[in-house]
């Protein structure tokens, strides 16, 4: 098959492309590399000076980006399959994206929408306070209020992003959810065209290390995106970790990095035993899965639903925390006080990713889905 993957979140599309290529398919990834993260791609579409304080530069960047898009789009036809990372799959205002979507629809075969991140249905599910016990938007029946959430509610529920999401979700041939949360968000509305396929991870055995804390020092790693720290709960997790560090200074080492490119992030991550991921999730993120594949323990969401959707009844590698400061403190302190737990958790982490997220296994699931719809 000839496959186009358009847009990028957390290296999902590039990793999927590697798997599809290994299975013999022709794949093109077109993206901006998820902005500052700099993920690989075949064709780059980066919008320059988008946050510049100089209005002339911002305007020039917009014009150059649009010209680049028009040039690239002429080459994006004749594919058997097109998959979009999100309804907002290019860096334009949502009301300007639909003509590009229609062009792709007209000049290619089957079109799939990825449910891989923030969109209308994820926001809506978080706000109903019943789909999830907790999420980025709720804890029980209480809504979380912060600047990020207010912006997302405005844009996705009451603005043109939500309208674009509805139009694409209703028109596309299929929707693929990469995490339990996204599947649960779309299932009430699009069960007939929704498929769950886990995120793909390259399982490189040469990089797997058990990283046993032989000197009694447990090394923690925290990656911070400053603009999303409150939204993702990193602020609470880091505060809890600092408290544990202060209580056990001889047994705890903390590394904090902020908004670094992907390759640098991975290099720094490699030195740790434990990674702190997201506080309000049921499932580990792509970054957390990458860490687990290398033999690292992840503190994140490991709720029963996340294991059930992939059919995992044995392994429990994820240190599951509830969305509270006290829960995080307790779980982190237990790791420091009982480092003998780490080897088993590390081995289970590697096995978990190998069973469910290996990029070749995941790519094969995508191939089966694509071929099924192409035959209809």
What annotation goes with each model-predicted range?
Residues 270-283, 296:
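Acidic donor-binding loop of glycosyltransferase active sites
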Residues 39-41, 113-159, 227, 303, ...:
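Acceptor-binding helix/loop patch of EC 2.4 sugar-transfer enzymes
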Residues 297-304:
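Short hydrophobic beta-strand element within catalytic cores of glycosyltransferases
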Residues 122, 152-194, 239:
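A short, active-site helix/loop in glycosyltransferases that binds the activated sugar's phosphate group
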Residues 340-371:
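A charged, aromatic-enriched C-terminal amphipathic alpha-helix characteristic of glycosyltransferases
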